[in-house]
Amino acid sequence: MNKRVLLVIFFVTLLVADEVNSFSFFRKAKGFLKKIWKSKIARRLREKGMKALKNYANDVLNGPAEAPAPAAAAPEEPPVEQRRRRR
């Protein structure tokens, strides 16, 4: 997945949990959303979101990591001579 998509999912889950916890009329939905929040898949998404957020913050603060130097290119094959057409 794209890093931006993971960040969006991470922030949306945080906002949904915060809103649900702040309203009292969501009592039934609150229990359901707490179960979802504690589920394995939500935990994994939050972990990926935190990693993506940390990586993004490091990239912003330190600049992007330099790309490794390309390996020595394989020698190119000599050009193939074109055959003359007979008339």
From Swiss-Prot:
Function: Inhibits angiotensin-converting enzyme (ACE), but does not serve as substrate for the enzyme. Potentiates bradykinin (BK) on the isolated guinea pig ileum as well as the isolated rat uterus for contraction. Also potentiates in vivo the depressor effect of BK on arterial blood pressure in the normotensive anesthetized rat.
Organism: Lychas mucronatus
Signal peptide, first to last residue: 1-22
A Gene Ontology molecular function term of the record: toxin activity
One GO cellular component, as annotated: extracellular region
Superkingdom of the source species: Eukaryota
Composition skew (Low complexity), residue ranges: 64-75
Stated family: Belongs to the non-disulfide-bridged peptide (NDBP) superfamily. Long chain multifunctional peptide (group 2) family.
Region (Disordered): 64-87
Biological process per Gene Ontology, one example term: regulation of blood pressure
Tissue: Expressed by the venom gland.
Protein's name in the database: Bradykinin-potentiating peptide NDBP12
Compartments it resides in: Secreted
Keywords: Cleavage on pair of basic residues, Hypotensive agent, Metalloenzyme inhibitor, Metalloprotease inhibitor, Protease inhibitor, Secreted, Signal, Toxin
Upper classification of the organism: Eukaryota, Metazoa, Ecdysozoa, Arthropoda, Chelicerata
Keyword hit for Secreted: yes
